[in-house]
Amino acid sequence: MKILHVCSELYPLLKTGGLADVLGALPQAQNQIGLDARVLLPAYPAITAGIQNTQVVAEFDNFAGHVVLRYGEYNDVGIYLIDAPHLYGREGNPYHDAYYNDYGDNYKRFALLGWVGAELATGLDNWWRAEVVHAHDWHAGLCAAYLFNKGKPAKSVFTIHNLAYQGQFSYHHLYEIGLPTGMFHVEGLELFGQISYLKSGLFYSDASTAVSPTYAQEITTPEFAYGLQGLLSGLKAQGRLVGILNGVDENIWHPNVDQYIPHHYKLKYMAGKKKNKAELQAYFNLPQDESALAFVMVTRLTEQKGVDLLIESADEIVKQGGQLMILGSGAPHLEQGIRELAAQYPENIAVKIGYDEALSHLMVAGGDVILVPSRFEPCGLTQLYGLQYGTLPLVRKTGGLADTVVDSASESIKARTATGFVFENATPEALRHCLQRAFALWQKPRAWTMVRTDAMEQDFSWRKAAEQYRTLYERL
């Protein structure tokens, strides 16, 4: 079965969020189970720098100007690149300029991405024709509309990585992107008087997926749906909206092969974890105390990630003699709040503002508990890394966090299903109580080791996700 993934980011060449991680791993996993998956991307400078050996597949002029379609390979996956320098030849972020202003021609840049995705299902490449066009997030949302307008020559799937970004543009652009005005309708592209690329993906695709079963349920409610609850709850009722969890790329995130950590370890030989903890404490200039419960947090510093909840309850960690290490950047007032905590409690709390890939790996490997107290989290990857590394996730019960972490209540510990700590209400009090429960378990080393073992035995491989997507494709 020939699958074309249409997207705007690819790890490690270009990444602004978790979308890139998915596209860096899922197509490869699908090829390993016998599918024929390829990826279509705009030829951004960062992408072309990493995929230099390409051949021309097609050359044409359309509503977006002169376009060359190229083909190359990256990590054993076939990659199509849309070479249109007037649209994509911009350094840095793919969506906005250095001042965070969205590019004024984004409507055209991402319409072209969708258009080429549909054309690859109708013979644009003489040697390969997509049978399923799998579009990701709003950037690729018009794929399904172009396919619909062509009489649906291929099956279409649309994956929502984050519903908060919708790709809305003025309706008059419809004349510039080659779609009939009849599609601008509440039963079509229209949302609040504008064209919505995200709604296009949902409305016209044969099936839509969200990146976790709980998030697929949450987005049918007004709180999470951004005005699309009617459409989304309808799709859910028809069985056209399902949740499939993201996986972990075990070539990059596994404690026995991780290239960024000084000491490798695995379930049967855990000595390396203690050594990584000592290295981590030394990096952050905290006391190298093996008995101190070490909490780590690697995140964007935003309210969505629950950082404000942690700021208000972090004194509990200090009171109980624990340590807290934070890596991230984001809202200035939260950066300031974290810095003030570290200044107030220099023996217990340390922070690095910014992002550091190598340090993030050491934190996951060296910590005892990884904090993910998000207000909402479509899937979440850091808690999956925590499970993989035996760093117990402490999470709020939402989205993918609810699907992947089982609370260490006494009955679940006995049943060998517990893998971390879970709290429900997005309040500092609820988080504080959860921190207290983590300290209580830490006082019982045998029980802690048991939960850690069960956490590390969880399977969140991309192979598992690839099989679930194959089942979905076959159902269409």
UniProtKB/Swiss-Prot annotation:
<comment type="similarity">
    <text>Belongs to the glycosyltransferase 1 family. Bacterial/plant glycogen synthase subfamily.</text>
</comment>
<dbReference type="Pfam" id="PF08323">
    <property type="entry name" value="Glyco_transf_5"/>
</dbReference>
<feature type="binding site">
    <location>
        <position position="15"/>
    </location>
    <ligand>
        <name>ADP-alpha-D-glucose</name>
    </ligand>
</feature>
<dbReference type="InterPro" id="IPR001296">
    <property type="entry name" value="Glyco_trans_1"/>
</dbReference>
<keyword id="KW-0328">Glycosyltransferase</keyword>
<comment type="function">
    <text>Synthesizes alpha-1,4-glucan chains using ADP-glucose.</text>
</comment>
<keyword id="KW-0320">Glycogen biosynthesis</keyword>
<dbReference type="Pfam" id="PF00534">
    <property type="entry name" value="Glycos_transf_1"/>
</dbReference>
<dbReference type="GO" id="GO:0009011">
    <property type="term" value="F:alpha-1,4-glucan glucosyltransferase (ADP-glucose donor) activity"/>
</dbReference>
<comment type="pathway">
    <text>Glycan biosynthesis; glycogen biosynthesis.</text>
</comment>
<dbReference type="GO" id="GO:0005829">
    <property type="term" value="C:cytosol"/>
</dbReference>
<protein>
    <recommendedName>
        <fullName>Glycogen synthase</fullName>
        <ecNumber>2.4.1.21</ecNumber>
    </recommendedName>
</protein>
<keyword id="KW-0808">Transferase</keyword>
<dbReference type="GO" id="GO:0004373">
    <property type="term" value="F:alpha-1,4-glucan glucosyltransferase (UDP-glucose donor) activity"/>
</dbReference>
<dbReference type="InterPro" id="IPR013534">
    <property type="entry name" value="Starch_synth_cat_dom"/>
</dbReference>
<dbReference type="GO" id="GO:0005978">
    <property type="term" value="P:glycogen biosynthetic process"/>
</dbReference>
<dbReference type="InterPro" id="IPR011835">
    <property type="entry name" value="GS/SS"/>
</dbReference>
